[in-house]
Amino acid sequence: MAQHLTTEALRKDFLAVFGQEADQTFFSPGRINLIGEHTDYNGGHVFPAAISLGTYGAARKRDDQVLRFYSANFEDKGIIEVPLADLKFEKEHNWTNYPKGVLHFLQEAGHVIDKGFDFYVYGNIPNGAGLSSSASLELLTGVVAEHLFDLKLERLDLVKIGKQTENNFIGVNSGIMDQFAIGMGADQRAIYLDTNTLEYDLVPLDLKDNVVVIMNTNKRRELADSKYNERRAECEKAVEELQVSLDIQTLGELDEWAVDQYSYLIKDENRLKRARHAVLENQRTLKAQVALQAGDLETFGRLMNASHVSLEHDYEVTGLELDTLVHTAWAQEGVLGARMTGAGFGGCAIALVQKDTVEAFKEAVGKHYEEVVGYAPSFYIAEVAGGTRVLD
């Protein structure tokens, strides 16, 4: 796995690429979601946490109107130059569309960015792993601009600009969870977020003798091109059908009883399954938060398992790779629970594992996965850390 960078190394790399010293260095985390999957755009609750894998940045303000972007993850792209006056989506500009989108919407919101800057980026979130490398980069860009141009920016506004970039610049109809988790993250805390009201609690993540193991399928998932938007559309159509008899705006307003009672209104079996997942996953997330606060990790683990079953059978976003990881994890000693995390269709799963069984767990799950899928997965221990911040 890619290494963590010191600020010295970051500054040295910036100097090597741009020939001048960086003004400041920054870090923006990735995220895992403990439970509450595909509920954020359905007006439900989510339970994410920022992690110590993320995106490092170094920046230097320029005297002209040119933005110069460089990513150590895409060295072959070299330095990509963009005029500050021309911030539009261009496919050939690749990863830089994320920072371009953020800067565009900051300007649109009335923030003055009157000069260009040189921007060096290095991420140690595995690409396409579903740990929110794009939201990490969005928040990183916002915090860089905030400090270089002394913008008066509420963090929540920056979170919303990240989501706006994803939806209206990149073209992915994602919810607000990723940006919120990354922008508002705190050390050793998970974020219990109501995506309808944006009310949230920072919940101490006391896992006792257990750790969260991230299991990477190493199958890339492309969110923009996936069935993600299709699932969202199915849920929106289900809401329309339910509105014939119910005064609701989102599936997150319903409970288990209501979805059973009014299921006859949803005319398509697949849409009913999608709606049932959204409603029951929200209920599971409510219960999981109570269990974690009470220190009941066994119940928390069982809810994780139930979440995966629902994502596999009702929401149908898992696939061979994720199912192989999770089903194999369930069979191992010392595992309290396991589920896919993120949008699905590849990417990562997580497991709650007793510390002293982690090595045996990785060996057994890795071996079986390779036999079934044909290549090895990767494993990381999730360290829950703070949100996007200045390093020096």
From Swiss-Prot:
Locate the coiled-coil region(s) and give their ranges.
Answer: none
Q: Which PANTHER family match?
A: GALACTOKINASE-RELATED, MEVALONATE KINASE/GALACTOKINASE
List the gene name. galK
The site (Transition state stabilizer) lies at: R31
Q: Where is the active site?
A: D178
Which GO cellular component term is one of those annotated?
A: cytosol
Organism, as annotated: Streptococcus pneumoniae serotype 4 (strain ATCC BAA-334 / TIGR4)
Question: Which residues does the record give as substrate binding sites?
Answer: E37, H38, T39, D40, Y228
Q: Which reaction does it catalyse?
A: alpha-D-galactose + ATP = alpha-D-galactose 1-phosphate + ADP + H(+)
Q: In which pathway does it act?
A: Carbohydrate metabolism; galactose metabolism
Q: Which compartments is it annotated to reside in?
A: Cytoplasm
- What is the recorded name of this protein? Galactokinase
Q: Which residues bind ATP?
A: S71, G128, A129, G130, L131, S132, S133, S134
* Pfam families documented for this protein: GalKase_gal_bdg (PF10509), GHMP_kinases_C (PF08544), GHMP_kinases_N (PF00288)
